[in-house]
Amino acid sequence: MKYQQLENLESGWKWKYLVKKHREGELITRYIEASAAQEAVDVLLSLENEPVLVNGWIDKHMNPELVNRMKQTIRARRKRHFNAEHQHTRKKSIDLEFIVWQRLAGLAQRRGKTLSETIVQLIEDAENKEKYANKMSSLKHDLQALLGKE
């Protein structure tokens, strides 16, 4: 396993996940009867500061349909948690309009690069173009000064 599992931390994440799903109206318990489901949810809500007991609640009461989705969510959260420790692996997000993302993805595909590599290439191209324009402007100015003095 690439990322270490931290039981207390992950139990807190599981608790938050289940509470969020409950508030969104999903059935988080295995019980069909509303009173039994509400009773189990009340027990879960009381376990906020008891991360070790959350896993026991999950084994006993959780809706089996949520098992894989919760595992995926926790796995992704664990990855983000450990990647955030290092600057080079920390992910940043940017807001792009869909059409911009689509064009960037197309360019990346044509170049055989990732989106990040394509963005770096575009920045380098823009910087080189700027340097070239400054150099040409400087040469033009020097040439005009040279021709004007003769």
From Swiss-Prot:
- Give the protein name, as stated in the record: Macrodomain Ter protein
Keywords, alphabetical: Cell cycle, Cell division, Cytoplasm, DNA-binding
GO terms in the biological process aspect are:
cell division; regulation of DNA-templated transcription
Any one GO molecular-function label of the UniProt entry: sequence-specific DNA binding
Q: What is its main location?
A: cytoplasm
Tell me, what does this protein do in biology?
Answer: Required for spatial organization of the terminus region of the chromosome (Ter macrodomain) during the cell cycle. Prevents early segregation of duplicated Ter macrodomains during cell division. Binds specifically to matS, which is a 13 bp signature motif repeated within the Ter macrodomain.
Q: Fetch the Pfam families from UniProt.
A: MatP, MatP_C
Work out whether the entry's keyword set contains Cell cycle.
yes
State the family named in the UniProt similarity comment for this chain.
Belongs to the MatP family.
Query: Where is the protein situated, by its record's location annotation?
Result: Cytoplasm
Electron transport as UniProt keyword: no
Q: How does it assemble?
A: Homodimer.
Q: Name one GO cellular component term.
A: cytoplasm
